[in-house]
């Protein structure tokens, strides 16, 4: 699984709404089409060239820069080199992957809760409101929001946003991205309002998106999990493959 993930999702990822791909000899980066951000998602560096490549990425970044570091990325002291270049680490996440055929689907929704795909701009706005409340304002980059809006008019959709509702109140939100030409779909978001945590809402939201990926013919489902969600996902059948740390740098 890890070899397939590295090749399909990191070395040669597919572009999506609002996201461009730039493949070079030592790095692969994703770039926001509005130029406001870039991210190094794959690298193959050595002790001899790492500092030079890192410095070049920092220098070329017009907007915010993220270096998506995985625990198996060489050289072994790459975290120290990123820190020396002025980048700062975010909390460590766990790369989890599930074979969709092994998941127990469908996942039962909690009583009084329904999960639905977003079909209009109002739904996208609601998704953003939930994320802002759960993760803090500005947690979802504007280019990502625009990508979800753009996907509404595409067939098949490269991104599906999903909301969990309790009556007329949106209580959780997430999205699933379909990486056509690969074996992978990926999960993002998944934030649930504090008063609804521990009731199975997160599992239902994962299950809904897993069914969408299954119905589109994808083999694997991938997510970068925080400590709170990791045990839930592992209980559903996801397997840890690596640790990953976003290293961030913003221009002055």
Residue ranges and their predicted role:
Residues 139-195:
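A conserved beta-strand-loop-helix scaffold within acyl/acetyltransferase catalytic domains
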Residues 34-45, 70, 183-194:
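Conserved acetyl-CoA binding element of GNAT-fold acetyltransferases
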Residues 1-60, 74-75:
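N-terminal charged segments
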Residues 47-122, 223, 245-249:
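Acyl-donor-binding surface of acyltransferase catalytic domains
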Residues 74-89, 203, 215, 227-244:
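Conserved active-site alpha-helix within GNAT-family acetyltransferase domains
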Residues 49-58, 189-194, 198-211, 215, ...:
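Conserved acetyl-CoA-binding loop-helix of GNAT-fold acetyltransferases
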Residues 62-64, 130-142:
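Helix-loop element at the rim of GNAT/NAT acetyltransferase active sites that forms part
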Residues 20-24, 74-88, 158-174:
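Conserved beta-hairpin
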């Amino acid at each position: 699984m890890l070899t397939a993930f590295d090749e399909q999702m990191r070395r040669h990822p597919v572009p999506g709404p609002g996201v461009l791909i730039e493949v070079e000899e030592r790095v692969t980066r994703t770039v926001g089409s509005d130029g406001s951000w870039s991210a190094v998602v794959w690298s193959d560096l050595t002790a001899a060239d790492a500092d030079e490549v890192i410095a070049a990425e920092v220098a070329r970044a017009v907007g915010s820069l993220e270096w998506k570091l995985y625990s198996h990325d060489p050289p072994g002291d790459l975290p120290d080199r990123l820190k020396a270049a002025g980048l700062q680490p975010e909390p460590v996440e766990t790369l989890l992957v599930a074979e969709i055929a092994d998941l127990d689907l469908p996942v039962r929704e909690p009583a009084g809760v329904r999960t639905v795909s977003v079909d209009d701009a109002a739904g996208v706005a609601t998704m953003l409101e939930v994320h802002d409340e759960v993760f803090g304002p500005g947690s979802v980059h504007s280019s990502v929001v625009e990508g979800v809006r753009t996907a509404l008019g595409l067939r098949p959709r490269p991104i599906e946003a999903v909301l969990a509702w309790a009556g007329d109140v949106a209580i959780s939100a997430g999205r699933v991205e379909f990486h056509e030409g690969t074996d992978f779909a990926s999960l993002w978001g998944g934030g649930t309002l504090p008063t609804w945590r521990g009731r199975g809402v997160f599992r239902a939201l994962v299950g809904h998106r897993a069914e969408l990926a299954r119905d589109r013919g994808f083999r694997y489902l991938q997510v970068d999990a925080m400590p709170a969600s990791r045990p839930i996902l592992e209980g559903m059948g996801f397997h840890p493959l690596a640790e990953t740390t976003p290293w961030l740098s913003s221009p002055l």
